[in-house]
């Protein structure tokens, strides 16, 4: 079942997913806005800024021209930063209006649109042609590009209101080291993906401050409770948060040095200021804008999210990171399950 697939976004995750699909026997075109990156991928088969010391398939072709990249595609996979997804979707829609294609639209980005607090499938649904909206598929779960690149075992979720679309995407990606489960709870899968980055910032900060495993386990457990509370209030299924796109993604993101959100939190905990952390990372730290969006959603929904609020205070109100933890610990005693 060879398909023509356009992958939009040549960062670490987008480029490695494109390489996986190419290795699975599909015809893959990888789009990047950077002509220099396209040249590197096509001539050297490398992407040193994002995935150092890795050789991409020689049959994988990169493009800087969006029209060429998506021409004839059966599937279009968005793997661009959250802040860019609406603009890129508008550009894709302009091309589709001329070509009259009806591809399946998939996204593997993790975040919430900061200005609107919308999930990314909602953003896509507002921009893509009407007839493509019902079959949007979300790819999410515990995954690091570096590990997929070396064929480590990885399991993630494909979620869609259209079960047949999710099953098609499942078959595109599955192989000996990459397994996908389907789910119909798009809301829960997307919120798990976005909100776990906030908790990963906190876990990294605890490490940078010198706290041990007890504190990190407590943070992840209570953080998952916050994610679930907000998610259910916004229409998610509770069980989704104990699945791959919930607790699975939280564990891998909040415990691994591969996680840019964990690394950013670690630097903040070690005493670096936020601007320096952002400047030195060189890649998007989705947990930062997601913290603001989640905090404001919690206020609107009247949902208690003390960990998220503490991280928001550090990021957006210049609160002292060493002081917010004792403040959390001194909160009024409560039942664990409410």
Swiss-Prot record:
Gene Ontology BP terms:
carbohydrate metabolic process; glycerol-3-phosphate biosynthetic process; glycerol-3-phosphate catabolic process; glycerophospholipid metabolic process; phospholipid biosynthetic process
InterPro entries, from UniProt? 6-PGluconate_DH-like_C_sf, 6PGD_dom2, G3P_DH_NAD-dep, G3P_DH_NAD-dep_C, G3P_DH_NAD-dep_N, NAD(P)-bd_dom_sf
This protein's GO CC annotations = cytosol
The annotated active site, in chain numbering, is 196 (proton acceptor)
Keyword set for this entry?
Cytoplasm, Lipid biosynthesis, Lipid metabolism, NAD, NADP, Nucleotide-binding, Oxidoreductase, Phospholipid biosynthesis, Phospholipid metabolism
Q: EC number(s) for this protein?
A: 1.1.1.94
Q: Which Gene3D superfamilies match?
A: N-(1-d-carboxylethyl)-l-norvaline Dehydrogenase, domain 2 (1.10.1040.10), NAD(P)-binding Rossmann-like Domain (3.40.50.720)
What are the binding positions for sn-glycerol 3-phosphate in this chain?
A: 110, 141, 143, 196, 249, 259-261
The reaction(s) this protein catalyses: sn-glycerol 3-phosphate + NAD(+) = dihydroxyacetone phosphate + NADH + H(+); sn-glycerol 3-phosphate + NADP(+) = dihydroxyacetone phosphate + NADPH + H(+)
- Tell me the route in metabolism or biology where this protein functions: Membrane lipid metabolism; glycerophospholipid metabolism
Question: Could you give a GO molecular-function term held by this entry?
Answer: NAD binding
Q: What is its main location?
A: cytoplasm
User: Which EC class is the enzyme in?
Assistant: oxidoreductase
Where it sits in the cell: the answer is: Cytoplasm
Q: Does the keyword Transmembrane helix apply?
A: no
Q: Where does NADPH bind?
A: 12-13, 110, 145, 260, 284, 286
What function does the entry list?
A: Catalyzes the reduction of the glycolytic intermediate dihydroxyacetone phosphate (DHAP) to sn-glycerol 3-phosphate (G3P), the key precursor for phospholipid synthesis.
Q: Which family does it belong to?
A: Belongs to the NAD-dependent glycerol-3-phosphate dehydrogenase family.
Q: What is the official name of this protein in its record?
A: Glycerol-3-phosphate dehydrogenase [NAD(P)+]
Q: Which organism is it from?
A: Lactiplantibacillus plantarum (strain ATCC BAA-793 / NCIMB 8826 / WCFS1)
Taxonomy of origin reads:
Bacteria, Bacillati, Bacillota, Bacilli, Lactobacillales
């Amino acid at each position: 079942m060879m398909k023509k697939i356009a992958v939009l976004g040549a960062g670490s995750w987008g480029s490695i997913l494109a390489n996986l699909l190419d290795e699975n026997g599909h015809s893959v075109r990888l789009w990047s806005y950077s002509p220099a990156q396209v040249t590197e991928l096509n001539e050297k088969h490398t992407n040193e800024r994002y995935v150092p010391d890795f050789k991409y398939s020689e049959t994988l072709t990169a493009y800087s021209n969006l029209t060429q990249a998506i021409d004839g595609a059966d599937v279009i996979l968005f793997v661009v930063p959250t802040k860019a997804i609406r603009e890129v979707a508008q550009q894709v829609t302009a091309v589709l209006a001329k070509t009259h294609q009806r591809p399946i639209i998939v996204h593997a980005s993790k975040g919430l649109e900061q200005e609107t607090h919308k999930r990314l499938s909602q953003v896509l649904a507002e921009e893509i042609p009407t007839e493509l909206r019902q079959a949007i598929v979300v790819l999410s779960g515990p995954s690091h590009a570096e590990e997929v690149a070396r064929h480590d075992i990885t399991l993630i979720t494909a979620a869609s209101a259209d079960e047949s679309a999710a099953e098609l995407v499942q078959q595109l990606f599955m192989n000996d080291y990459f397994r996908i489960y389907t789910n119909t709870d798009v809301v829960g899968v997307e919120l798990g993906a976005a909100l776990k980055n906030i908790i990963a910032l906190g876990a990294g900060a605890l490490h940078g401050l010198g706290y041990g495993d007890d504190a990190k386990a407590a943070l992840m457990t209570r953080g998952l409770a916050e994610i679930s509370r907000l998610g259910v209030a916004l229409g998610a299924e509770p069980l989704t948060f104990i699945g791959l796109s919930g607790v699975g993604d939280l564990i891998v993101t909040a415990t691994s040095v591969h996680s840019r959100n964990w690394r950013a939190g670690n630097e903040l905990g070690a005493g670096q200021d936020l601007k320096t952390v952002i400047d030195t990372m060189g890649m998007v730290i989705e947990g930062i804008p997601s913290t603001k969006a989640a905090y404001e959603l919690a206020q609107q929904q009247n949902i208690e999210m003390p960990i998220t609020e503490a991280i928001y205070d550090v990021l957006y109100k210049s609160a002292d990171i060493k002081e917010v933890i004792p403040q959390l610990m001194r909160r009024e005693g409560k039942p664990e399950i409410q």
